[in-house]
Amino acid sequence: MKLPKEGDFITIQSYKHDGNLHRTWRDTMVLKTTENAIIGVNDHTLVTESDGRRWVTREPAIVYFHKKYWFNIIAMIRDNGTSYYCNLASPYYLDNEALKYIDYDLDVKVFADGEKRLLDVEEYERHKKQMHYSDDLDFILKENVKILVDWINNGRGPFSDAYVNIWYKRYVELKNR
């Protein structure tokens, strides 16, 4: 698979552990691709849920995917500041169809005022039983929650204002070409 270039549009597909398609984002603009990471932006992007419902993202959001870490990060740029939605998920896989990952239910939300919340713990525990998450997988995901919280607490990567500003500025430049 040829890596997408800056300005290319890709589809993102989220799956569940049992292989079922969970959610699809159409036309995410790629801002940067490296050997291990993809940075993109969603802005009024069409999202299709597994039940067929469709909606459009409201604000620009910088998205970060990595091949090493078991999470992805969405930095939502809002009038009152940047909020984050972080999915505990498999490292991404890229093929000719889409960027793909498995969503493991647990989410960390960071509000513009810095408040953090771990979400969907009950859903995670339910799916862990239903879909037979292994003990090794459970350990990996819980360790990655710790890594993610460390990134948040230390303003690392996508949790840095400078990071969000640089990539949003680049998006505006590309959009207006």
Curated annotation (Swiss-Prot):
Its EC number is 3.6.1.15, 3.6.1.6. The active site is at R23 (proton donor). One of its GO terms (molecular function) is nucleoside diphosphate phosphatase activity. It catalyses: a ribonucleoside 5'-triphosphate + H2O = a ribonucleoside 5'-diphosphate + phosphate + H(+); a ribonucleoside 5'-diphosphate + H2O = a ribonucleoside 5'-phosphate + phosphate + H(+). The keyword Metal-binding applies. Keywords: Hydrolase, Magnesium, Metal-binding. SUPFAM superfamilies: FomD-like (SSF159234). Mg(2+) 2 binds at D105, D107, D120, E123. Mg(2+) 1 binds at N87, D103, D107. The keyword Zinc does not apply. Transmembrane segments: none annotated. Its cofactor is Mg(2+). NCBIfam families: PRK13662.1 (NF010183). Belongs to the Ntdp family. Has nucleoside phosphatase activity towards nucleoside triphosphates and nucleoside diphosphates. This is Nucleoside triphosphate/diphosphate phosphatase.
